[in-house]
C-alpha cells in the first residue's frame, strides 16, 4: 500500500440491478480523485448464479459480462467492455483498482452428479453424523454459453470437497463431504473446521484446481489491468494456498501486486496468526477494530474510549492493517450485520482517516448514503478524506487519557504546506483537552474545520492548545491557511 493511501469500497449490497454500475464508476473517477481517493475496491465482476447476484455466488469467472449464461449476458453491474472502460477511467484519474477475488466456492452448476458422501455437522465439521450415502449434487460446471473460450477447463465433483445440498433429500442439516476428501487442515478453527462456507466447496489441494486457478488469475490480471486484489473469505481456504500463489505471482510477472484479505474474525490473535501463516504476503481488513467501533456505538458513554484501539490489528501490526468502519456484509439485513450507529460514524472515520497507522477503506454507502435502506450519509466524511490527503502528516502524539474524551495531534511535515492538525472525540458530554502541537506552532491559531466552534484555539509559547468538541461528536482543528483552503474548496 502507498503512503497516505485512502481506499473506497465502491459498491454496496443493495445497488440497483440496472446494468449501469460500471458506467457510473467511470463517471465518478475524476470526482473521487479530486476528493483524495487513491484506490477503489470494485465488486466481483464475473458471472454469478443470476443477473441479480451481487457477485459472491460465483458461476463462471471467465465470464465478465460477455456470454449468454444464467439468463443474461451482462452482470448486475454491466458488460465486460464497460468494466474494463471503468478501470481505464480510474487509471486516467490516478486511482488504483482492487478487484474482488472469490475463489472459495462455486454455485449454479450446470448438471447433477451422483456422488458418494458422508454427512458432517454444520456446527462442528469434525463431527460425522451420517455414514456413506449417495447424493445428487450440482457439481458439474461445463459453461455451455462460453463454449470453451479462454479456457476449456470444466469442473466436476473431483474438484470439490463437499456441499450442503442433496437434490434428492433436500435436507439442510448436513454438510456432505465427498468420500476420499477431507476439509483442509489449515483453516479457521470456528465450527471445528471452517473450510466449508457455501455452495460447492473448491478443493484447493487438487493439483488441477491449483493450476487452473493460477491460470485464471493471470488471465484476469492481463485482461483487466487491475492493480491489486481483495481476497474474499481467506479464513475458509487452506492457509498455504494464498501464501504460495502470491509468491509465485510476485516472482513471475507481478512483483508489486498488492493484496488485502478478508479474514472475518474479531479476534486479533487469529488475524496475526494468519498473517504469520502466509508470511505477511497480504494485508488484512481490521475486523477487530470494526467490532470496537460497533460496540462503542452501542454502549455510548458506558464505553471506555481510551481503549478504542486496543486489541486490534492496527495497534499490533499497523503496516498490514486495512481499517474500515462498515462494509457490504455488515449492512442491515446481511449475514454479518453489525452496522455502526450513525452518531458514532464520524468519530470512527476520524480514527481511521486522520491517524498515521493503517490504510483506511471508506464504505460507499457512508459517503453517498443508502436510499434503498433509508440510511443517511456520514456528515463531513468528504471533508475528512480531503483533510487526510492534504494535512494529516507528521509525528503523531496521542492523548488517550480519559474514558470519554480522547484526542491526538499530527505535527505536519515540510513536504506538505500547512500540514498538521488536532482531533478530539467525545462519547459523552462536551469535551475539552489540552494537547501539545509543538514549539514550532507557538503563536498560531487553529480553526474548527467542521464549523461548530467559531473561536480559534491559540497555541501558547510552549506549543500547547486547549481544544474543544461538542457532546457525542468529533472536532477537527487545522491551521489558518488550511482552514481557508477548505472553505474555498467546499
Regions found by a protein language model. Give the residues of each.
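Active-site-proximal helices and loops of the catalytic beta/alpha 8
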Residues: 2-5, 24-33, 46, 50-62, ...
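Long, low-complexity, polar/charged, intrinsically disordered or flexibly structured peripheral segments
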Residues: 152-208, 222
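Substrate-binding cleft of carbohydrate-active enzyme catalytic domains
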Residues: 75-109
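Boundary/entry segment of secreted carbohydrate-active catalytic domains
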Residues: 1-19, 196-206
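Glycine-rich FAD cofactor-binding loop and adjacent beta-loop-alpha segment at the N-terminus
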Residues: 64-69
